[in-house]
Swiss-Prot record:
<dbReference type="GO" id="GO:0004765">
    <property type="term" value="F:shikimate kinase activity"/>
</dbReference>
<dbReference type="InterPro" id="IPR027417">
    <property type="entry name" value="P-loop_NTPase"/>
</dbReference>
<protein>
    <recommendedName>
        <fullName>Shikimate kinase</fullName>
        <ecNumber>2.7.1.71</ecNumber>
    </recommendedName>
</protein>
<keyword id="KW-0067">ATP-binding</keyword>
<feature type="binding site">
    <location>
        <position position="15"/>
    </location>
    <ligand>
        <name>Mg(2+)</name>
    </ligand>
</feature>
<dbReference type="GO" id="GO:0009073">
    <property type="term" value="P:aromatic amino acid family biosynthetic process"/>
</dbReference>
<dbReference type="GO" id="GO:0005524">
    <property type="term" value="F:ATP binding"/>
</dbReference>
<keyword id="KW-0418">Kinase</keyword>
<feature type="binding site">
    <location>
        <position position="132"/>
    </location>
    <ligand>
        <name>substrate</name>
    </ligand>
</feature>
<feature type="binding site">
    <location>
        <position position="116"/>
    </location>
    <ligand>
        <name>ATP</name>
    </ligand>
</feature>
<dbReference type="InterPro" id="IPR000623">
    <property type="entry name" value="Shikimate_kinase/TSH1"/>
</dbReference>
<dbReference type="GO" id="GO:0005829">
    <property type="term" value="C:cytosol"/>
</dbReference>
<comment type="subunit">
    <text>Monomer.</text>
</comment>
<keyword id="KW-0963">Cytoplasm</keyword>
<feature type="binding site">
    <location>
        <position position="80"/>
    </location>
    <ligand>
        <name>substrate</name>
    </ligand>
</feature>
<comment type="function">
    <text>Catalyzes the specific phosphorylation of the 3-hydroxyl group of shikimic acid using ATP as a cosubstrate.</text>
</comment>
<keyword id="KW-0547">Nucleotide-binding</keyword>
Amino acid sequence: MRHLVLIGFMGSGKSSLAQELGLALKLEVLDTDMIISERVGLSVRGIFEELGEDNFRMFEKNLIDELKTLKTPHIISTGGGIVMHDNLKGLGTTFYLKMDFETLIKRLNQKEREKRPLLNDLTQAKELFEKRQVLYEKNASFIIDARGGLNNSLKQVLQFIA
């Protein structure tokens, strides 16, 4: 088995699904945003504000290369922009958690939105969502309809890997 990599826009449920998959498959879960935050000593928002998005993306790209060297399979929950990196291919079997923009925004309360610097302006966020959707689909091994909730998404992934 290869790494199972969850991609999708912020708020699509990648972190929650990763935890459930980890339990179901008895695999370690890695979260790229969390790893970067711990290494840098700042939240994702803090990295964006103090070091800039370009530096965050560099950390992300380097982490992808590092994760490719792991010998055992993991569940990898990624940040929403990870699909912008050309080195994502080959990391593992990729699952795109697809959800419409309006549902994503409803799922995120104000406190959650404040943690996500790219959601400060919803008009810009929708444009970003539309641009990234193409990249998510291009990078996906499988597309998961994430509108049905966590259990439904879990069932879909487990069916694909059975």
